[in-house]
């Protein structure tokens, strides 16, 4: 019988497929992860409300928000530790919400490391590798032909099932259009649609699951001990833990444990690495080292990182884009620079960094009024005489004891090492300013700024202006 052969020596290195190579199998250039109309509820409480977002391959994404905003829930939904009530979780265009965590293209690092204390560093890293399979290098042509025939049968079955579900869902949606439905009937039909959508997700992945099962049985093999040892060595070098393979977990520092957790997750070659506040328990110096390590590894391996944190500085320094979450909704999803310089609304401006916020009136093109004076602005996108929110960042304000646009009085200052954070009262509005020069309490000073330093936003109610943040000041 003819066969397809190559070197099968146990000393050869197993085929290592990086996430960047896998993404090249995505000819339509689809997002690696897409959440579409995701809703998550616990009883009567809505945790996520109709979330939509799209993440590109090889991005470093940070989910940032206050406690209870829903950021960890988003991560858990992507990882398969939670299931949505409705909506789609798409991986390269295919809904994976029905798949359990071990069938998803992701690996997760938790805040508490989740290492096995009875295993050594090497044992922890090998844990996932013992389940990993690599393609056989000597497969009979008849076996490949059988596999191809089975794939065609599986595809036909899946297509028929999805067509049936399409018709069922359309029927339910038509029934939902009736104005005569009671709330109970409407809820019942919506639940049927939600349940059938999970069935649809299963059949979307049916062929891949069958192919994996067949391949594991007939077309692949487990890694040899030598191959696992090589991968462990490679991972320890990657996370700078050479020489610690035999170390006991309880003998490691917090930073070293986090590196082991990182090595274990990367060893199984996920497309997506999910990180749930992994650095929050580390001291400042070790935390900075781990931030650099994560950034370097993400760039080197060209993986997609989705990182949850409450640390704004960490998010700005590490991310390609940041998802700002508030009360189960996405307030803004943009680059760190755009979120800082051009926040969507007053809440985002207040949440990210120091902010000088006050009510203003957009008078006409390039003219805005606040604090009883009229100033020039770069903005041209509002209707005349519209009430808006105005933002000036502390570092954009120029302080002088001689002249400026407005006059104020120094009320408080905090020394930050290379600069001072100074509070200046202007017309009963408290300004926060960064300055390298020291000013005495109650000293009169003048403030000015460049034309493009004033950012105008649509008026947002229910969020205070210039609320003093004691953690920041």
Swiss-Prot record:
Keyword hit for ATP-binding: yes
Positions of ATP binding: 65-72
Region (Insert) residue spans? 133-221
- Gene3D superfamilies linked: 2.40.50.100, P-loop containing nucleotide triphosphate hydrolases (3.40.50.300)
Coiled-coil ranges (or none): none
One GO MF annotation is:
ABC-type polyamine transporter activity
Q: Where in the numbering of this chain does the ABC transporter domain appear?
A: 33-352
Q: What class of enzyme is it?
A: translocase
Q: What is its EC number?
A: 7.6.2.11
Span list, region Disordered: 1-21
Matching SMART domains: AAA
Q: Where is there biased composition of kind Low complexity?
A: 1-13
What PROSITE patterns does UniProt report for this protein, alphabetically?
ABC_TRANSPORTER_1, ABC_TRANSPORTER_2, POTA
Locations listed in the record: Cell membrane
Instruction: Please classify the protein's predominant subcellular localization into one broad category.
Output: membrane
Report how it sits in the membrane: Peripheral membrane protein
Keyword field: ATP-binding, Cell membrane, Membrane, Nucleotide-binding, Translocase, Transport
What this protein catalyses is:
ATP + H2O + polyamine-[polyamine-binding protein]Side 1 = ADP + phosphate + polyamineSide 2 + [polyamine-binding protein]Side 1
The superkingdom of the source organism is Bacteria
**GO CC aspect terms:** ATP-binding cassette (ABC) transporter complex
What does the similarity note say?
Belongs to the ABC transporter superfamily. Spermidine/putrescine importer (TC 3.A.1.11.1) family.
Tell me the subunit arrangement. Answer: The complex is composed of two ATP-binding proteins (PotA), two transmembrane proteins (PotB and PotC) and a solute-binding protein (PotD).
This chain's function reads:
Part of the ABC transporter complex PotABCD involved in spermidine/putrescine import. Responsible for energy coupling to the transport system.
- Put simply, this protein is called Spermidine/putrescine import ATP-binding protein PotA
Q: Which organism is it from?
A: Mycoplasma mobile (strain ATCC 43663 / 163K / NCTC 11711)
Q: Which gene name belongs to this protein?
A: potA
């Amino acid at each position: 019988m003819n066969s397809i052969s190559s070197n099968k020596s146990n000393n050869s290195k197993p085929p290592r497929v990086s996430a960047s190579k896998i993404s090249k199998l995505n000819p339509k250039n689809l997002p690696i992860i897409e959440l579409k109309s995701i809703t998550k509820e616990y009883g009567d409480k809505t945790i996520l409300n109709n979330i939509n977002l799209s993440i590109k391959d090889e991005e470093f994404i940070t989910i940032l928000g206050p406690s209870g905003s829903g950021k960890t829930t988003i991560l858990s939904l992507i990882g398969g530790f939670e299931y949505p009530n409705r909506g789609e979780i798409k991986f390269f265009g295919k809904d994976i919400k029905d798949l359990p965590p071990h069938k998803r293209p992701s690996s997760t690092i938790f805040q508490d490391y989740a290492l096995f204390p009875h295993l050594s560093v090497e044992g922890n890293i090998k844990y996932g590798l013992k389940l990993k399979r690599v393609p056989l290098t000597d497969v009979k042509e008849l076996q490949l032909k059988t596999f191809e025939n089975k794939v065609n049968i599986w595809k036909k079955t899946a297509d028929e099932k999805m067509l049936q579900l399409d018709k069922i869902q359309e029927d339910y949606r038509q029934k939902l259009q009736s104005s005569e439905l009671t709330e109970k009937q409407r809820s019942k039909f919506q639940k049927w649609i939600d349940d059938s959508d999970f069935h649809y997700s299963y059949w979307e992945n049916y062929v891949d699951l069958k192919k994996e099962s067949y391949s594991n049985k007939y077309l692949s093999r487990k890694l040899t001990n030598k191959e696992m040892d090589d991968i462990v060595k490679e991972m320890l070098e990657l996370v700078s833990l050479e020489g610690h393979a035999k170390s006991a977990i309880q003998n490691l520092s917090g930073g070293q444990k986090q590196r082991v957790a990182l090595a274990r997750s990367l060893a199984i070659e996920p497309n997506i690495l999910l990180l749930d506040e992994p650095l929050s328990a580390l001291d400042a110096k070790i935390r900075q080292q781990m931030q650099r390590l994560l950034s370097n590894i993400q760039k080197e391996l060209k993986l997609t990182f989705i990182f949850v944190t409450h640390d704004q500085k960490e998010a700005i320094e590490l991310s390609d884009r940041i998802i700002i979450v508030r009360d189960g909704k996405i307030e803004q999803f943009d680059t760190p620079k755009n979120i800082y310089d051009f926040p969507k609304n007053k809440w985002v401006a207040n949440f990210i960094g120091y902010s000088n916020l006050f009510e203003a009136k957009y008078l006409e093109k390039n003219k805005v009024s606040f604090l009883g004076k009229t100033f020039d602005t770069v903005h041209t996108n509002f209707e005349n005489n519209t009430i808006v929110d105005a933002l000036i960042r502390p570092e954009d304000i120029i302080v002088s004891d001689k002249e400026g646009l407005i006059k104020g009085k120094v009320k408080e200052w905090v020394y930050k090492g290379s600069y001072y954070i100074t509070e200046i009262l202007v017309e009963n509005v408290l300004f926060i300013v960064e300055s390298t020069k020291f000013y005495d309490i109650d000293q009169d000073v003048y403030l000015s700024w460049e034309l493009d330093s004033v950012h105008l936003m649509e008026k947002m109610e229910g969020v205070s202006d210039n609320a003093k943040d004691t953690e920041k000041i």
